[in-house]
Amino acid sequence: MQPITTEIVSRTIIKRPADSHKGNYGRIMLIGGNQNFGGAIIMAATAATYSGAGLVTVATDPSNFTSLHARLPEAMVIDYHQTDTLLNLLAGMDVIVIGPGLGTDTVADQLLTAVLAATHVPQRLVIDGSALTLLAQQARPLPATDIVVTPHQMEWQRLSGIAIKDQTPTANHDAQQRLGVMAVVKAHRTTVYTDERVWFNPGGTPAMATGGMGDTLAGMIGGFVSQFHNFTDAVLSAVYLHSAIADDLAATRYVVLPHQISTRIPTYMHRFSQIERP
């Protein structure tokens, strides 16, 4: 295993050109948030927005519209029950994040199937939360494009068939190879599995053990892969920065909340963008 290093982050997060516009930094759609779990998609969308995604669209249950408008006025919202509208918009997206707060009912299952069928190269796909449970319950074809799954250990057990106690780096890497997608397995020391190697995140703190932390990471990953060309480096940088911010906050806090991480993402990205490169 290799550690995710600050060198990876600093070569990924670069200064923005002076003539930039929002179209340069990716169009991202985040899909999730049923009537009971609207907070999950709000936290994911917040992280994507603060990570610098150019245009953010949230497809969610209408019960979440008011909260989304109030908490994140930068994001556009659509009703995820209107499948035709969703798929028409999805065709123009650079990145799709599906799963935070999605649930596992029939509506969620049909939505996941439709999104997987519609996603295409060169779009990038982040699969998180409930969508991973649905994939574990029923295997279905995955699009031939850049995909990252972001399971915690129990979700990885369902998806890979490997019991938590047996989730060694070797076993996990074998499972990742079979699945054919990048895997971010969240644990005390999160590990990232690519076709070529295994990475481990040196950061992380028990202060992060609270609901919504994974939703925030999924949104960060979506925001990073929407604007940075190297898919692997973008994912690794999001994983690293998510924990690095939390570690700094935990120096003076017993608990770190997801939104506290999100609001600090631009500051940390700016810091890395200022590092002089050879």
From Swiss-Prot:
The keyword Oxidoreductase does not apply. AMP binds at residue 214. Keywords: ATP-binding, Lyase, NAD, NADP, Nucleotide-binding. It catalyses: (6S)-NADHX + ADP = AMP + phosphate + NADH + H(+); (6S)-NADPHX + ADP = AMP + phosphate + NADPH + H(+). Pfam families: Carb_kinase. InterPro entries: Carbohydrate_kinase_pred_CS, CARKD, Ribokinase-like. Residues 5-272 form the YjeF C-terminal domain. (6S)-NADPHX binds at residues 40, 103, 152, 215. PROSITE patterns: YJEF_C_1, YJEF_C_2, YJEF_C_3. GO terms for molecular function: ADP-dependent NAD(P)H-hydrate dehydratase activity; ATP binding; NAD(P)HX epimerase activity. It is an enzyme of class 4 (lyase). Its cofactor is Mg(2+). It comes from the Bacteria. GO terms for biological process: metabolite repair; nicotinamide nucleotide metabolic process. The keyword Chloroplast does not apply. Its EC number is 4.2.1.136. Homotetramer. Catalyzes the dehydration of the S-form of NAD(P)HX at the expense of ADP, which is converted to AMP. Together with NAD(P)HX epimerase, which catalyzes the epimerization of the S- and R-forms, the enzyme allows the repair of both epimers of NAD(P)HX, a damaged form of NAD(P)H that is a result of enzymatic or heat-dependent hydration. HAMAP family: NADHX_dehydratase (MF_01965). Belongs to the NnrD/CARKD family. This is ADP-dependent (S)-NAD(P)H-hydrate dehydratase. It comes from Lactiplantibacillus plantarum (strain ATCC BAA-793 / NCIMB 8826 / WCFS1) (Lactobacillus plantarum). The lineage of its organism: Bacteria, Bacillati, Bacillota, Bacilli, Lactobacillales. The gene is nnrD.
